[in-house]
């Protein structure tokens, strides 16, 4: 006679009759085993759900990591910006920055000798043009066959030349004369102070 096997209790019943199975299913051991079985089943389902969500999250994070890796590779492939060089060290082949034009000196200011005058002050007459009509920038050597020497030097005798480069159309200032030295005695009321020869007498005294 075959016996009935209970999956929840993992036991064989003595008889396979419906009355015996009904009596076994009504017992407290069978009910406790059924409760434990479904609790384990729910725990397994919950764990499998958690594992699935974790795998999905890791898959998305992996996709983000792949995108980030591709972006980093793209950034590394781009050329880096040039480094700032310290002032005074220019690489070979590069032109230095263009400096602004010098400011015009104030009215009446004369540049030192040897320095070419960039701009004449307002109202000053312009120097005469060269003989052959070719203008040269200040500081440039003269053209062969044309009079004049380098800036700051007088023209060579026998050759025609224009005014010096520092000429601005104004006459030179008069020489500065110092006052005669005072006598060491400090006598400022001496009548013979202006007379260079004190022994000479005036013609009025002889009369």
Swiss-Prot record:
A zinc finger (Matrin-type) spans 4-36. Residues 132-144, 184-207 have a biased composition (Low complexity). Keywords: Metal-binding, Nucleus, Ribonucleoprotein, RNA-binding, Zinc, Zinc-finger. It comes from the Eukaryota. Coiled coil: none annotated. Pfam families: zf-U1 (PF06220). Its main location: nucleus. Residues 105-207 are annotated as: Disordered. It is found in: Nucleus. PROSITE patterns: ZF_MATRIN. Gene3D superfamilies: Classic Zinc Finger (3.30.160.60). GO terms for biological process: mRNA 5'-splice site recognition; spliceosomal snRNP assembly. Residues 105-115, 122-131, 162-183 have a biased composition (Pro residues). One of its GO terms (cellular component) is U1 snRNP. GO terms for molecular function: mRNA binding; pre-mRNA 5'-splice site binding; U1 snRNA binding; zinc ion binding. PANTHER family: U1 SMALL NUCLEAR RIBONUCLEOPROTEIN C. HAMAP family: U1_C. Belongs to the U1 small nuclear ribonucleoprotein C family. Component of the spliceosomal U1 snRNP, which is essential for recognition of the pre-mRNA 5' splice-site and the subsequent assembly of the spliceosome. U1-C is directly involved in initial 5' splice-site recognition for both constitutive and regulated alternative splicing. The interaction with the 5' splice-site seems to precede base-pairing between the pre-mRNA and the U1 snRNA. Stimulates commitment or early (E) complex formation by stabilizing the base pairing of the 5' end of the U1 snRNA and the 5' splice-site region. U1 snRNP is composed of the 7 core Sm proteins B/B', D1, D2, D3, E, F and G that assemble in a heptameric protein ring on the Sm site of the small nuclear RNA to form the core snRNP, and at least 3 U1 snRNP-specific proteins U1-70K, U1-A and U1-C. U1-C interacts with U1 snRNA and the 5' splice-site region of the pre-mRNA. This is U1 small nuclear ribonucleoprotein C. It comes from Arabidopsis thaliana (Mouse-ear cress).
